A protein has these predicted regions:
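N-terminal short beta-loop-beta anion/metal-coordinating cradle
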Residues: 1-66
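Short active-site-adjacent helix-start/loop capping segments
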Residues: 13-14, 52-55, 79-83, 99-100
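Proline-aspartate-enriched helix->loop->beta-strand connector
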Residues: 68-72
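Mid-sequence, gly/pro-rich, charge-dense loop/helix-turn segments that line enzyme active sites
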Residues: 80-129
Length: 129
């Protein structure tokens, strides 16, 4: 299994890239994809750039070009609350649109208001915390 790990800014992925073994860098679409092993697992690490359009495009490249079966987004996640501090971990069990009318979104494929996270990754993240 290949794991895709992405962040929005270089500071969010640079330390991961530095820990990769047997690393190769493959530029594609303006993004550098760092392929290698981390803790014995095959991973592809990249900096997607900020915003959901960049995240969506980079996620699709990780899946279709690099064969990533699971994706982890690592970073500051645009924290807008004082309840979450530096070093805290947020595990997203579901994600949804915040800037579109959900009734309109659900009229078109894939007809979903929200997307569930991968149960295996959620369990692993919870166990690590």
């Amino acid at each position: 299994m290949i794991l895709g790990i992405m962040g929005a800014m270089p500071d969010e992925v640079d330390q991961l890239c530095a820990k990769l073994e047997n690393v190769t860098v493959e530029p594609y679409g303006g993004v550098e994809y760092h392929k290698g092993t981390l803790a014995g697992k095959q991973v592809v690490v990249c900096c997607a750039g900020m915003g959901k359009a960049n995240a969506a495009a980079t996620t699709q490249v990780l899946i279709t070009k690099f064969g990533a079966e699971k994706i982890i987004f690592s970073g500051i996640a645009g924290n807008m609350t004082s309840k979450i501090g530096i070093g805290d971990v947020v595990i997203g069990k579901t994600v949804l649109y915040h800037d579109a009318q959900l009734d309109m979104i659900c009229q078109n494929p894939p007809f979903l208001k929200e997307y569930s996270g991968d149960p295996e990754l959620i369990a692993a993240a919870e166990a690590a915390c």
